[in-house]
């Protein structure tokens, strides 16, 4: 299996308690499972202001969110290893981890896995899609040594 190349951008004023690029790569690898290519993705860690702006601009939601996924769409005749960008809001991830009583790094891992699956084309708009995506997320998180990220909801 080939490693996902991670371009980590930290655009948060507070860079403490963030996962390392190696951790992010491990979590993304588990979700993407690249066999024949070496995919590349950007992970941008931002503050609430940027997350809010992007969420409003691209999803019409007037609030910050935990993770936004921007899949890279390339013309069929061009082969590039880019799969897309993840934008993750530090404050939202920290707040959710506290509210859900989860270890912070487990929640960071879940956001990387969740966002990576979106980059691969998975979605959770329809119930059947949501069930499949949650099943995959749980399987991947367990393989990484974390607990089921949806345990509080089940």
Swiss-Prot record:
Q: For binding Zn(2+), which residues are annotated in this chain's numbering?
A: 114, 118, 124
The processes (GO biological process) annotated in the record are: rRNA processing
Cofactor annotation comment? Binds 1 zinc ion.
Q: Which GO terms describe its molecular function?
A: metalloendopeptidase activity; RNA endonuclease activity; zinc ion binding
* EC main group: hydrolase
- Identify the keywords attached in UniProt to this record, alphabetized: Cytoplasm, Endonuclease, Hydrolase, Metal-binding, Nuclease, Ribosome biogenesis, rRNA processing, Zinc
Q: What does the UniProt entry say about where the protein is found?
A: Cytoplasm
| Xref: Pfam families | YbeY
Question: GO cellular component terms?
Answer: cytoplasm
The EC number(s) this enzyme carries: 3.1.-.-
- Would you indicate the residue range of the signal peptide? none
Indicate yes or no for the key word DNA repair.
no
What cofactors does the UniProt entry give for this protein? Answer: Zn(2+)
Database matches in PROSITE patterns: UPF0054
Q: So what does this one do? A: Single strand-specific metallo-endoribonuclease involved in late-stage 70S ribosome quality control and in maturation of the 3' terminus of the 16S rRNA.
Family (UniProt): Belongs to the endoribonuclease YbeY family.
Q: What is this protein called?
A: Endoribonuclease YbeY
